[in-house]
A protein has these predicted regions:
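Charged, often Cys/His-bearing segments associated with DNA-binding zinc-finger transcription factors
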Residues: 1-61, 302-303
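Short helix-loop boundary/capping segments at the starts of domains
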Residues: 30, 34-41, 75-79, 100-103, ...
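Short, amphipathic alpha-helical "recognition" segments used to contact nucleic acids or chromatin
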Residues: 62-77
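Short, well-ordered secondary-structure "scaffold" segments embedded in the functional core
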Residues: 80-306
Length: 306
């Protein structure tokens, strides 16, 4: 069975397996320990439980191993049977462990836009200078009140669909004010502008900030006149762009490449890239956990805000 104590001694192998370095993995496991204890106790004390506390089979995996199992699944999207071979467990047991652990993982991470599962309390050591941990869009806007540029984009992920094809690849609206990601899942064939409206991102942006987008966001300036909207110029029907307009589009693309890099970081976790084969009601949960992992890496590897 994979042993955490051995893998953390090989930083490159650990980062290749789960996307975190040993320090980030250890801190996250320590943060998850009390969350798992509380969730397990709540389950034991639930109404209708007949067996006494302590009875029954004990869990085979502790919190660090359960975290490693979940992160490997998010990173590589391996079949449950293969994960069962790696951790010497039945595939059904692997599935139960992962799906029970995902909500706690999202709660422990700086994940976006799912306020009902986020713990946004600011906790700092007694001997340290108080610091702000950026977990929500409001935290980012409060810490960076001078934010001037917001870049929005969309991405898709294929998933199963019924025979009548009422739905298909889910499109995600991705906003990037500093290092915070925001998501809104929709059905197949939905235009980028409609996704942006459904995400409810625009009313929450700082007044006077600039909004950057691709040609799919042409017309956003009519929705938010208090913002400066910058999108590439579209070629007129039957016409051509002038050299000045082509150069302007090139400069806009150099700014917009930032959000493309963010999408690339998200898609390194195969659960957000490959064919989605889980319950559609958990789609946002998976994306929230992955976005939280990307945020965690970004925050921990950037200067802290005092």
């Amino acid at each position: 069975m994979l042993q955490v104590s051995r893998i953390v001694q090989r930083p490159r192998s650990l980062e290749s397996l789960c996307g975190l370095n040993p320090t980030e993995f250890t801190l996250l496991a320590e943060h998850l320990e009390p969350l798992w204890t509380q969730a397990h106790r709540t389950s034991l004390l639930r109404e209708g439980r007949k067996r006494r506390i302590g009875a029954g089979r004990q869990f085979k995996l502790n919190v660090p191993h359960r975290l490693l199992l979940t992160l490997i699944y998010l990173r590589h999207y391996l079949p449950m049977h293969l994960l069962g071979v790696l951790f010497e467990m039945d595939a059904a047991n692997v599935c139960r462990n992962i799906h029970a652990f995902l909500p706690l993982l999202e709660q422990a991470l700086p994940a976006p836009l799912r306020a009902r599962t986020l713990d946004i309390r600011k906790v700092a050591p007694d001997d340290a200078v108080p610091r702000r941990r950026l977990r929500t869009l409001e935290d980012v806007l409060a810490a960076f009140s001078e934010i001037a540029d917001i870049i929005v984009d969309g991405t898709e992920q294929p998933r199963g669909q019924p025979k009548k094809k009422r739905s298909g690849p889910g499109k995600k609206a991705v906003g990037r004010p500093k290092d915070q990601k925001q998501f809104s899942g929709v059905k197949k064939g939905t235009h980028d502008m409609k996704v942006l409206k459904q995400s409810r991102l625009l009313p929450r942006l700082p007044r006077g900030s600039r909004v950057w987008g691709d040609r799919g966001y042409t017309g956003v300036d009519k929705l938010c006149p208090q913002h400066e909207v910058i999108v590439p110029r579209m070629r007129p029907k039957g016409g051509k762009l002038s050299p000045e307009e082509r150069e302007l589009n090139h400069q806009i693309a150099k700014v917009r490449i930032t959000v493309e890099n963010v999408v690339c970081k998200l898609k390194k976790f195969r659960v957000c890239k490959e064919f989605y084969r889980n319950d559609t009601r958990r789609h946002g949960l998976f994306w929230g956990c992955v976005a939280g992992l990307v945020n965690l890496r970004t925050v921990n590897r950037a200067p802290q805000i005092a």
